């Protein structure tokens, strides 16, 4: 069911995004996480994004504190030293609550085309992070379900393509809300205890598979080289 929910997040994002880099290039990652920011389910996308989101989620919790994360919040983060990505890869996180207790997050990391960086599009010759555009350090775009219009306007006035940027932002928000609702429905149906047991089973199963694969590797020291365009 969690995989199905993640795939639904994926479909909603693709169907509602404004940018070709989302609905054609698939430059995004979506996932569902537990309350320790451990990945439980992901949909097809850039795996590095989904892996980076757990780090971003931990930074959000550390920055805001558990006491300042509330039901129906949605938090944006793109500060590279907290989000494990460059500035244009923006994380949105929706905390998931049951009986007023944080049980997890749904999250989307997605490339935005323009946040006022020094050059339109990609700028590969920047010399510091401040040339990459607007920095968003764990700010709430939704506060207890209420849209933060001040932050919307800040983003609007810092983008050369505001309609496109805000359209992609809304697609991301919708995707996060989808994941949040599906997990809430799951817990309502089966109960918190059953959900917690299922989460631990998922993580234990993943660890067992990884250990089996590692055990098949021959003993030795391994290294590799590869090349990228200059």
Regions found by a protein language model. Give the residues of each.
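N-terminal leader/propeptide and maturation segments of large enzyme subunits in energy/redox metabolism
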Residues: 135-209
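Extended, highly charged
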Residues: 1-16, 36-49, 172, 184
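A short, hydrophobic, proline-anchored segment that marks a local hinge/packing element in signaling
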Residues: 89-99, 107
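Short, small/polar residue-rich loop motifs at catalytic or cofactor-binding pockets
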Residues: 24-27, 88-90
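Gly/Pro-rich active-site capping loops and adjacent beta-alpha segments
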Residues: 102-158
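Gly/Pro-rich turn-and-neighbor structural signature
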Residues: 26-77, 187-230
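Short, basic/aromatic recognition patches
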Residues: 1-25, 61, 65, 77-83
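Short, Lys/Arg- and Gly-enriched loop/turn segments at beta-strand edges
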Residues: 83-89, 115-116
């Amino acid at each position: 069911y969690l995989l199905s929910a993640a795939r639904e997040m994926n479909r909603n994002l693709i169907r509602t995004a404004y940018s070709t880099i989302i609905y054609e290039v698939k430059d995004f990652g979506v996932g569902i996480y537990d309350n320790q920011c451990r990945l439980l389910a992901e949909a097809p996308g850039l795996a590095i994004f989904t892996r980076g989101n757990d780090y971003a989620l931990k930074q959000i919790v550390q920055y805001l504190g558990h006491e300042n994360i509330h039901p129906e919040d949605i938090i944006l983060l793109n500060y590279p030293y907290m989000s494990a990505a460059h500035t244009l890869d923006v994380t949105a996180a929706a905390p998931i609550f049951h009986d007023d207790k944080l049980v997890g997050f749904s999250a989307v990391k997605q490339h935005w085309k323009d946040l006022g960086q020094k050059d339109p599009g990609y700028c590969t010759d920047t010399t510091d992070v401040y040339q990459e555009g607007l920095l968003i350090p764990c700010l709430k775009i939704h506060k207890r379900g209420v849209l933060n219009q001040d932050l919307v306007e800040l983003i609007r006035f810092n983008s050369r393509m505001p309609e496109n940027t805000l359209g992609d932002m809304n697609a991301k928000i919708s995707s996060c809300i989808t994941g949040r609702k599906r997990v809430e429905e799951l817990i309502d149906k089966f109960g918190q205890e059953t959900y917690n047991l299922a989460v631990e089973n998922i993580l234990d199963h993943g660890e067992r598979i990884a250990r089996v694969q590692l055990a098949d590797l021959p003993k030795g020291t391994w290294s590799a080289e590869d090349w990228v365009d200059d």
